[in-house]
Amino acid sequence: YAKIKKDLAQKFPYDIDGYCDGKENFVREMEERALAQYDGTWDKLYIAARKVQHERKLSPLIEVGSVSAAVLSAKGNIYTGVCIDTACSLGMCAERNAIANMITNGESQIIKIVAVMSDGKAGMPCGACREFMMQLDKTSGEIEILRDYETKKVIRLKSLTPEWWSTDKMEMSE
């Protein structure tokens, strides 16, 4: 318990004087319950995406890295990518870049994805990225997308692609 208390004090350095007011057992129970429910996956994905997010100009016609993304594969691996903005339509979103990295490494099933915008906030995948993800696997509708890093608000891909045009084809591929 002392280790949990110390870890929480380091993660949340605010005054927790409830321990001095006879509330320690209640606070201990609440902390243990909260820690048991804590899933650091979104933090790992967000940090992985931020690590590769370095906005830079490759040439007068290509800028990269203003947006980054990280995907968690079904095998538990994390793959990252950055956006590639070109002077014509040959660019690539960070999400599709991360997915291409995953595919290059022999995987094709996504569990979670986060896109990090240039301001550091989580952002939603564009329509092309949503479509690409839906076409990857028959379970793609269950992909969790981080909407807000601070609150860990999540939405499933199927909520963003209602009545998807090729559900029947994906189900027939079984």
Model regions: which residues?
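Short beta-strand scaffold segments in enzyme catalytic cores
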Residues: E63-A74
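Compact, glycine-rich, soluble single-domain proteins
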Residues: V82-R96
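Short coil/turn segments at secondary-structure boundaries
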Residues: I4, L61-V64
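Short, charged low-complexity linear segments at domain edges
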Residues: C93-K112
